[in-house]
């Protein structure tokens, strides 16, 4: 996975899942349609309802996502402890439907981090100092490149880059596009070999 795009800097720490997608929009039985309500209480000055589009709302021009220069951004820069609070997979769906492919922050809530990989949204953890540098580049309109294979983030036409850690199984999942079941099936030969060895070494466990 190699993604290049513009980034929007959300300069707020401890953003919780209710701020990402408010609970009143979770009544929908569909998995789609949540992007219109991303950061709802910050993007809009009025109260929305399920089915309302942004064109029917009062836009908060002072919120960073509504600034003209950040329209079309595909990378979200955030601060520490992003997506804390209650567990809701809708938070990931809303970010993806809005157009984000990557979220970069110093840290993420564990459940949100896991949900990202289940849905193909890449969460990248960098230091606060590295995030600060990316904030400046984002505000200048620089394009940011995220290379999952090499595990690094760089800025177009700039020499420096920032490396990030990711578990090998999660990296493989993102690069292959496989879900948990597909990943398990890809290891079927090893699983069968283990089961045969287990049955041979501890046969009493398999007696009826």
Mark where each language-model region is:
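Cytosolic catalytic domains that perform sulfur/thiol-centered chemistry
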Residues: 1-79, 83-208
